Amino acid sequence: MSQSLKTYYKEKVVPLLMETFEYKNIHEVPKITKITINRGLGEASKNNKALESSVQELAIISGQQPVITKAKKSVAGFKIRDGMPVGIAVTLRSKMMYAFLERLIHLSLPRIRDFKGISVQLFDGRGNYNLGLKEQLIFPEIEYDRIDQIRGMDIAITTTAKTQQEGIALLKALGMPFNDN
């Protein structure tokens, strides 16, 4: 796909979805509002190096500086006190969001071992999609020699779709490789 994902959405996906779901107004067509990338780091409270390397990796992957999330209250069972770092998150919107989604669909997901497509059952029922990745090595920006530990991440794709069918149709039209199960 030589054209950007945003122009592809406007020129091809919007007319397709308007015809499929019989929308009367162009503003009824679902669109992606944001992509949130999140990584929980339980060891971040003890290991500051893990936190720094994760911040650096997520900044490379997303192209945007992540925010360090902190514990809201103390939990003795997890040995965490109020205000300790427990993870990192980055929210992508607009140009960065479409650039990341294009790289995810066309470069990163096909690099997963034994990849047969992603599950349709990861929708939340309101058109939002939540994807969990086991390792950061599927992104071509990450060099194997520079990582200290393999860590996963959660990717949440938030859409304006009202139903699960609309969300599936939107992401499928954008090229998301769903499996048939």
Curated annotation (Swiss-Prot):
Annotated family: Belongs to the universal ribosomal protein uL5 family.
Function: Binds 5S rRNA, forms part of the central protuberance of the 50S subunit.
Main location: plastid
Keywords per UniProt: Chloroplast, Plastid, Ribonucleoprotein, Ribosomal protein, RNA-binding, rRNA-binding
Oligomer status and interactors: Part of the 50S ribosomal subunit; contacts the 5S rRNA.
Listed InterPro entries: Ribosomal_uL5 (IPR002132), Ribosomal_uL5_bac-type (IPR020930), Ribosomal_uL5_C (IPR031309), Ribosomal_uL5_CS (IPR020929), Ribosomal_uL5_dom_sf (IPR022803), Ribosomal_uL5_N (IPR031310)
GO cellular component, one term: ribosome
Compartment annotation: Plastid, Chloroplast
Pfam families (UniProt xref): Ribosomal_L5, Ribosomal_L5_C
Domain of life (superkingdom): Eukaryota
GO molecular-function term, one example from the UniProt record: structural constituent of ribosome
Species the sequence originates in: Rhodomonas salina (Cryptomonas salina)
Family matches, as PANTHER family: 60S RIBOSOMAL PROTEIN L11-RELATED
GO biological process: translation
PROSITE patterns: RIBOSOMAL_L5 (PS00358)
Protein name: Large ribosomal subunit protein uL5c
